[in-house]
C-alpha cells in the first residue's frame, strides 16, 4: 500500500456530507415469473404450489435491489428529467452491460429511491465525470467537454486546450484520468481540476517474491490544476498538501467543495481501493492551501466502500445546501 494513504490514523471530524457508504436502491417493475425444478411427484405438467421448496421465483414486481449497472459504475448525479429531484445517470464502460443508464428518482430529496434502469445510450465511457459550476452540470473527459450531454449524450464535444506540460505524458500506464470544473480560486470562472494515476511503480499484482514480500512500489494518484487565466487554461502542476504533492493510492477522482462549511473549498480524493482522503483547506478562498490528508471518517469510524476502484462525485444530492458524495464502485453499485 502507498504509505501516504496509511500515514494518518487520526479520525477526521464528521463533515457535513452524506458520505456514508450506504447503497442506493432500485425498485423493479417487471412482471413476475416463476420457474421450477423437476419434481417426480407432480406427474404430468402440473405447476407446483407457491409453498413448494423447489420453486425459483424471479422478476418479482416491487422487489428492491441495490442500484447498479455491472462493471465499473461511474455515477453522474443530475436532475435528468427536470422534476426537481436529482436522478442518476450511470456509465458502465465494459461488458456485459456497456452503456449509459438513467435511474429516475421516484423518492424524495431526503429519501431517494430509484426506478429500474433505462438504457439511454449504447456507449458506455470510462473516465467521464460530472461537475457542477455556475449552478449547472457539466460532463467532461480527458481534454474534452460534452455540450448538450443531457439532450444527446456524446453527440457534441469541445476540446479543452491548455498551456504547459502535457498531463500524464511521462506515465507509461494510467487507468484513471478524471477532469472536472471548479472555481478553484474564487474569481468566478471555471478552472479545471484533474486527477491522474500512474501504475508505473506498481506494475501488476504478480510482484510478490517466494516469501510473499511485495517487490515493487505503490500506486500513485496525483491532482493537477489547470487555471483559467481569462485567456485560456494553464497547467499549474501538481496540487500540494502540507508542502508535498498530493499522492493517494491511485484513482484520485478529486472532489472540490466547501465540505466543512467555513467558506473555502476543501478537497476529498478517492483511491483505487476502498477509502476516501480528506484535505482541509487551511488557506483562503482565493489562495487554497491544504493540510495533510486524513482518512474520511465520521462518528462510526473511517468510511469504507464495499469494493475498490471507487469513483466519488460531489453533488448536493438532497438539496439541503451541503455537498454530498455519490460514489461508484467496481461492481457497478452506487453509494
Residue ranges with predicted function:
Residues 1-12:
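N-terminal secretory signal peptides that target proteins for export/translocation
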Residues 7, 17, 34-37:
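Positively charged, low-complexity intrinsically disordered regions
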Residues 14-27:
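Bacterial N-terminal signal peptides
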Amino acid at each position: 500500500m502507498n504509505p501516504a494513504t496509511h500515514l494518518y490514523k487520526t479520525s477526521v471530524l464528521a463533515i457535513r456530507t452524506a458520505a456514508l457508504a450506504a447503497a442506493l436502491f432500485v425498485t423493479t417493475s417487471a412482471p413476475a415469473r416463476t420457474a421450477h425444478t423437476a419434481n417426480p411427484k407432480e406427474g404430468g405438467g402440473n405447476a407446483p404450489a407457491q409453498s413448494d421448496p423447489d420453486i425459483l421465483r424471479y422478476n418479482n414486481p416491487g422487489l428492491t435491489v441495490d442500484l447498479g449497472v455491472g462493471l465499473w459504475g461511474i455515477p453522474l448525479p443530475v436532475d435528468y428529467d427536470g422534476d426537481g429531484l436529482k436522478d442518476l445517470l450511470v456509465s458502465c464502460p465494459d461488458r456485459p452491460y456497456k452503456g449509459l443508464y438513467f435511474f429516475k428518482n421516484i423518492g424524495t430529496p431526503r429519501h431517494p429511491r430509484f426506478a429500474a434502469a433505462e438504457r439511454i445510450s449504447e456507449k458506455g465511457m470510462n473516465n467521464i465525470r460530472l461537475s457542477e459550476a455556475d449552478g449547472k452540470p457539466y460532463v467532461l473527459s480527458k481534454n474534452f467537454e460534452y455540450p448538450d450531454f443531457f439532450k444527446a449524450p456524446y453527440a457534441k464535444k469541445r476540446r479543452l486546450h491548455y498551456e504547459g506540460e502535457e498531463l500524464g505524458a511521462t506515465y507509461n500506464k494510467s487507468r484513471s484520468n478524471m477532469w472536472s470544473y471548479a472555481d478553484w480560486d474564487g474569481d468566478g470562472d471555471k478552472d479545471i481540476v484533474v486527477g491522474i494515476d500512474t501504475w508505473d511503480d506498481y506494475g501488476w499484482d504478480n510482484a510478490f517474491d517466494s516469501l510473499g514480500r511485495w517487490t515493487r512500489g505503490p500506486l500513485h494518484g496525483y491532482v493537477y490544476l489547470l487555471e483559467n487565466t481569462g485567456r485560456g487554461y494553464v497547467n499549474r502542476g501538481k496540487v500540494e498538501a502540507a508542502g508535498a504533492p498530493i499522492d493517494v493510492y491511485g484513482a484520485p477522482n478529486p472532489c472540490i467543495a466547501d465540505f466543512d462549511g467555513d467558506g473555502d473549498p476543501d478537497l476529498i480524493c478517492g483511491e483505487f481501493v476502498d477509502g476516501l482522503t480528506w484535505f482541509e483547506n487551511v488557506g483562503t478562498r482565493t489562495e487554497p492551501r491544504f493540510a495533510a490528508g486524513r482518512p474520511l471518517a465520521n462518528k462510526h469510524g473511517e468510511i469504507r466502500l464495499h469494493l475498490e476502484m471507487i469513483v466519488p462525485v460531489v453533488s448536493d444530492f438532497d438539496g439541503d445546501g451541503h455537498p454530498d458524495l455519490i460514489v461508484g464502485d467496481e461492481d457497478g453499485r452506487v453509494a
